[in-house]
């Protein structure tokens, strides 16, 4: 069956918009002082994705939560329209837990991330494939990017993009593989030009290098 990739535009909440503009302003100042190193660029890219998800990590790994209500609302709308099972990918532990708390109010949901032991993961995967519940898996894509067959799902939603191409491409293959009987859909949620450019580069298997600099120069 065919696999379709869909882009879904969402808005930033006022709190996210404020954080995004502040970071963009800081980027411009930083770029004016001298070159942005590769390590700095990776950290800044991660910070942008945290703003998009609504969970910003501080210097000591403390988490500052900001509202991402429009993104969560869009996810719920997608889930209401989906008849088969669904996988939601989010790259940060705090966001995975937040989504689990929100979605379990209305759906049977399991979490897969680095905190879940291998035996428990396998039990979740077996139930997902063979039983009515869980209907939803919320996962860190890095923990589900290789070897699994999860064709009980027909839809994957990226709550925000990963910046790792191999992880993205392999995670999408969990539902688009032999044994799948439904048309499959990959939905990319994005609120900023940076997110859209990350998705474009993921699909094209291009490097993320220079992304932050392009933002600092006003090209994104």
Residue ranges of model-derived segments:
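Short catalytic-loop micro-motif centered on adjacent basic/acidic residues
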Residues: 87-88, 111, 157-158, 186-188
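SF2 helicase motor core recognition
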Residues: 95-100, 121-125, 134-183, 202
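Residue-level marker of positions within ordered structural domains that often coincide
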Residues: 25, 53, 80, 155, ...
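A conserved SF2-helicase RecA2
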Residues: 163-220
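Generic, ordered loop/turn and secondary-structure boundary motif
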Residues: 1, 52, 57, 149-151, ...
């Amino acid at each position: 069956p065919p696999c379709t990739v869909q882009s879904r535009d969402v808005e930033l909440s006022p709190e996210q918009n404020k954080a995004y503009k502040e970071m963009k302003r800081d980027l411009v100042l930083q770029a004016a002082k001298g070159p942005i190193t590769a390590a700095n660029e990776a950290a800044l890219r991660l910070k942008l994705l945290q703003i998009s998800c609504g969970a910003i990590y501080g210097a000591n790994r403390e988490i500052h939560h900001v509202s991402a209500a429009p993104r969560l609302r869009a996810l719920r709308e997608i889930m209401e329209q989906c008849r088969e099972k669904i996988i939601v990918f989010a790259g940060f532990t705090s966001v995975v837990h937040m989504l689990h708390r929100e979605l379990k109010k209305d759906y049977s949901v399991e979490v897969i991330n680095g905190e879940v032991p291998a035996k428990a993961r396998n039990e979740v995967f077996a139930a997902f494939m063979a039983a009515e519940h869980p209907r939803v898996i919320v996962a860190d894509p890095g923990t589900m990017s290789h070897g699994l067959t999860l064709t009980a799902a027909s839809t994957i939603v990226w709550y925000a993009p990963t910046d790792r191409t191999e992880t993205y491409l392999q995670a999408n293959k969990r539902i688009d593989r032999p044994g799948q009987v439904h048309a499959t859909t990959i939905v990319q949620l994005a609120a900023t030009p940076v997110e859209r450019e990350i998705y474009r580069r993921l699909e094209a298997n291009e490097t993320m290098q220079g992304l932050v600099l392009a933002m600092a120069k006003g090209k994104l």
